[in-house]
Amino acid sequence: MTAITITDAAHDYLADLLEKQNTPGIGIRVFITQPGTQYAETCIAYCKPGEEKPEDKAIGLKSFTAWIDGFSEAFLDDAVVDYATDRMGGQLTIKAPNAKVPMVNADSPINERINYYLQTEINPGLASHGGQVTLIDVVEEEAKNIAVLQFGGGCQGCGQADVTLKEGIERTLLERIPELSGVRDVTDHTQKENAYY
C-alpha cells in the first residue's frame, strides 16, 4: 500500500472539483516531476479513464480513484494531501517530505549515484560561491567510466575550477563510486562574467 494520505477535507474538495468536470470515471493522478532532485515538484492532475499509465498504482477512494505514478511512488512515502479553509476560501496543500530525497544504493545506475553525490555533497559546497556542477554524461574510455561534468554559476570561468575538479569533486566521486575512473570538465571557462575568482 502506498504511504500517501489524502485527508477527508482534501478528498471532499477534490471530489467536488471532479464532479464539475462532467466526465464519468474521472480521478486524479499524483506524481512528482524530477523526483529525488532539488527541483522536485509534487503534482496532482485530472486523470480521465484511460489516461493512467500502466505502472500507476490505483487507490480507490470513497468518490474517485487516485492514480499514483509508479516512478514517483517511493518519493511519495509519508506524503499528505490536505485542504485547509481560510478567509480567502481554501487551499489544497501537498506535503511530500521525501520528494527531493534521492533514492540510490550500490545497485543504482552509475549516473544516478553520481547525481546523488553531486546534489548532496558537492553542490552544497559550491553554492557558497554561487556555483554548481552538473553531470552531462558518463562515457567509457579504454574500459574506464569517466564522468563528464559542466560547471555553472560562479564556478564557470573561475581560476580555481581545475583545483576544485581534481581535489574536491573527483576525489569525492572516486571514493564513493568504485567503478568510476575519473572526471572531465567540458565547461567553457572563457566566460568569466560570473566567476567567483
From Swiss-Prot:
<comment type="function">
    <text>Involved in iron-sulfur cluster biogenesis. Binds a 4Fe-4S cluster, can transfer this cluster to apoproteins, and thereby intervenes in the maturation of Fe/S proteins. Could also act as a scaffold/chaperone for damaged Fe/S proteins.</text>
</comment>
<dbReference type="GO" id="GO:0016226">
    <property type="term" value="P:iron-sulfur cluster assembly"/>
</dbReference>
<keyword id="KW-0411">Iron-sulfur</keyword>
<dbReference type="InterPro" id="IPR017726">
    <property type="entry name" value="Fe/S_biogenesis_protein_NfuA"/>
</dbReference>
<dbReference type="GO" id="GO:0051604">
    <property type="term" value="P:protein maturation"/>
</dbReference>
<keyword id="KW-0004">4Fe-4S</keyword>
<comment type="subunit">
    <text>Homodimer.</text>
</comment>
<keyword id="KW-0479">Metal-binding</keyword>
<dbReference type="GO" id="GO:0005506">
    <property type="term" value="F:iron ion binding"/>
</dbReference>
<feature type="binding site">
    <location>
        <position position="158"/>
    </location>
    <ligand>
        <name>[4Fe-4S] cluster</name>
    </ligand>
</feature>
<dbReference type="InterPro" id="IPR000361">
    <property type="entry name" value="FeS_biogenesis"/>
</dbReference>
<feature type="binding site">
    <location>
        <position position="155"/>
    </location>
    <ligand>
        <name>[4Fe-4S] cluster</name>
    </ligand>
</feature>
<dbReference type="InterPro" id="IPR034904">
    <property type="entry name" value="FSCA_dom_sf"/>
</dbReference>
<dbReference type="Pfam" id="PF01521">
    <property type="entry name" value="Fe-S_biosyn"/>
</dbReference>
<dbReference type="InterPro" id="IPR035903">
    <property type="entry name" value="HesB-like_dom_sf"/>
</dbReference>
<keyword id="KW-0408">Iron</keyword>
<comment type="similarity">
    <text>Belongs to the NfuA family.</text>
</comment>
<dbReference type="InterPro" id="IPR001075">
    <property type="entry name" value="NIF_FeS_clus_asmbl_NifU_C"/>
</dbReference>
<dbReference type="GO" id="GO:0051539">
    <property type="term" value="F:4 iron, 4 sulfur cluster binding"/>
</dbReference>
<protein>
    <recommendedName>
        <fullName>Fe/S biogenesis protein NfuA</fullName>
    </recommendedName>
</protein>
<dbReference type="Pfam" id="PF01106">
    <property type="entry name" value="NifU"/>
</dbReference>
